[in-house]
Structures are given as C-alpha cells and as structure tokens.
Amino acid sequence: MRVVGVEQDQREFAEFYAAAWDDCLRIVMVGVGDRALAEDLVAEAFTRAWASWRKVGGFAEPRAWVIRCALNAHVSWWRRHRREVALGSHDTTAATSQDPGLDTSLVAALRRLPVRQRQVIALRLLLDLDTATTAEMLGMSGSTVTTHLHRACVALRRDIPARNDQERVQ
C-alpha cells in the first residue's frame, strides 16, 4: 500500500516541477544574475523539496518554498566562495541576454537594486505572492515589504526611463 503513496507523491512532484521550474528559475536569476548558478541553485532547491515533499507539497505556496530555499542556498554559496571571486570576473549581462522572456535592460535595472528590494520585486510581482506570504518568506513585516516594493518601483521608474532616453539620443 505504501507503493501507491510513493507513486502519488512522484506524480504530484513531477507535475509541480514541470509547472514551477521556469518561474523559480527566472525569479532566482533576478536575484543572482547568473543563469548557470541560478540553475544549480534551483536544482538543489527542487532536490530538497523532493526529499521533504510530503511536508512541502502541503504548503499553500510550494513554489515560494523552493525559491526561498534556492535564495538561501545562494547566500551559503556566496559565503563559501566570496574569497575566490575576483571583482568583474564575469559578465552577467551575457548570461541573461540569451534567455527568452527576459528584457536585458530590466534585468540590469533590477540588478542595481539592493538585494531585499530585488527579492520583494521577484516575489510580489513576478511570482504574484501577497504581502503577508512575501513577508513571511523574507522574515520581515508586511509594512517593510510594502516599503521595499515602493522604493524599488520608484528606483526602476527613475532608472528605466533614463535608459530609454539615452537610447533615443544615440
């Protein structure tokens, strides 16, 4: 009888994986700016999700759990590798320019935002989570989420039209 439960878990997880992979990858890419690293982090997060699928599958937003797990893995990765990374060692714009559905000027503008603002933008606008869920995922209050979202939108409005004006002049 346990086999039936395992098969159902496998089927549910496979459906979740197929439906959530692209969203998770794009949101993590916004956070880390490197497609290869984002793919590794998302793969690790999905591996952890499968290992705890009975728990994770019961969450209201399992995608949010996977994204949070991937972003936490990025923090851990950065702590291990920060001494090895040379400033300016690679161009992240090239990594994102080949991705369909991503506007490179928007990705560049998002990368200039502080990390918390990027995370709020990714969760609230790209993943369409509500303020309370975003706040819980990021470990902050709902009003802090709203403040970060407002500041990020102001910065993006200021940055993106300026880039568009420069392109028209050239």
Feature annotation, model-predicted:
Residues 76, 83-110, 130, 165-169:
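Internal acidic/polar
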Residues 21, 25, 46, 114, ...:
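C-terminal flanking helix
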